[in-house]
Swiss-Prot record:
Membrane-spanning intervals of the chain: 6-26, 359-379
Domain of life: Bacteria
Keywords linked to the UniProt accession: Cell membrane, Membrane, Transmembrane, Transmembrane helix
Annotated protein name in UniProt: UPF0754 protein BpOF4_11355
Cellular component terms (Gene Ontology): plasma membrane
Subcellular localization, as worded in the UniProt entry: Cell membrane
């Protein structure tokens, strides 16, 4: 009976010592939080392991995260994965549709998000400035060149081929004019002015023939003249010669005849009236964006996501270096309080720490049992 009590006592003592030792070891991972001293003598094992190695832990965690966890290769694979691409595609499509179906205007977006004041007026001013710069640059580069050199080859050829058409058009308009009553009246006035300028000779002709008779004689002859093929060839030759002369003149000749301010203002106003985008600036997106929804969501969004993913994957290593993730992780871990870290670790590993304590008690009890047997055997 004494033997059983002795061995049981040894087992209990061993279990208590083993369990208490492991429990103390676990607590000494974190505690004490600060160094303890008795006079000038530092108490051993203070502070605890984690507080003592807090800075080294932060450095190693930063190194581990950058070189083994958040690597450029791993993030690049994630960016190009089908799951991520689909998630980004769906998210961007949803957000884009939400925006397109809203009451917001392009002007409001520019003003709220980019800080552009009076967006439409600013846009028109930028357009006007761009037109003015283009105007100045064109004449600065081409002022002393011939007009024929400056015009594109296609324009030159088109005008050359259009000369017969222009000649025919002018003759047709002339026939239409002088065959009408209005044209006849104008012709009569022209004859009057002509005869008036001829003095006595003109008066004699008017007196013998009469104005009406002269108009009646001249109008059919004029119509016959304008319908004649020779007249058409003559007009074509005149136009071709004048066009050839014009092409040999310097561009400066045109510049002298133009008013830059009027042209810039005219082109800006024409763009504002005829380019739909200028009108959309002040209209809600939902009023005009519907025809573009499918094109944007089906065609543009996937291409945009793919392009952004490729761009990020290509420059990811450089971006990570510029972000200095290692320093960020280190600073965050250093700023993390040991108390909070202890609470976090214990919350996650509470069951495992208890099992370690129980294991220490079990091993201590087994050692106590063996020691009891040895004592009895030796005694």
């Amino acid at each position: 009976m004494d033997t059983a009590w002795f061995i049981g006592f040894m087992v209990v003592i061993g279990a208590v010592i083993g369990g208490a030792t492991n429990s103390l070891a676990i607590k000494m991972l974190f505690r004490p939080y600060t160094e303890k001293r008795i006079g000038k003598w530092r108490v051993p094992f203070t502070p605890g392991l984690i507080p003592k190695r807090h800075q080294e832990l932060a450095i190693q965690l930063g190194h581990m995260v950058v070189h083994y966890l958040l690597t450029a290769e791993g993030l690049g694979k994630k960016l190009k994965s089908a799951v991520f691409m689909k998630a980004m595609n769906d998210w961007l499509s949803t957000e884009l549709l939400k925006l397109l179906r809203s009451e917001l205007t392009i002007g409001e977006l520019l003003e709220d998000k980019l800080g552009v004041k009076e967006p439409k007026q600013t846009l028109l001013q930028k357009t006007e400035g761009l037109i003015e710069k283009s105007y100045d640059r064109f004449f600065q580069e081409n002022r002393y060149k011939q007009i024929g050199e400056v015009l594109p080859r296609g324009v030159n050829e088109k005008i050359d081929h259009s000369v017969p058409v222009i000649a025919a058009f002018l003759l047709e308009r002339g026939q239409a004019l002088f065959s009408s009553e209005e044209g006849k009246e104008r012709l009569s006035k022209m004859i009057d002015r002509f005869l008036l300028n001829k003095g006595t000779l003109g008066n004699m002709i008017s007196m013998f023939l009469g104005n009406e008779r002269l108009v009646d004689k001249l109008q059919p002859e004029l119509m016959k003249f304008m319908r004649d093929d020779g007249t058409k060839r003559m007009v074509e030759e005149i136009l071709e010669k004048e066009w050839a002369k014009l092409k040999q003149k310097d561009v400066a000749l045109i510049e002298d005849q133009l008013n830059k301010e009027d042209i810039v203002e005219y082109m800006t106003t024409a763009l504002e009236k005829n380019v739909t985008f200028y009108q959309w600036v002040d209209q809600p997106l939902c009023d005009w964006s519907e025809p573009f929804e499918d094109m944007l969501v089906i065609n543009w969004v996937p291409k945009l996501v793919d392009a952004v993913s490729d761009l990020l994957a290509l420059h990811l290593e450089g971006l990570l270096e510029k972000l200095n993730l290692e320093d960020i992780v280190r600073e965050q871990v250093e700023a993390f309080s040991v108390e909070r870290l202890e609470e976090l670790v214990l919350t996650i590993s509470k069951r495992e720490f208890k099992m370690i304590t129980y294991l220490g008690a079990l091993l201590g009890g087994m050692i106590g049992f063996i020691q009891g047997l040895l004592v009895l055997f030796i005694g």
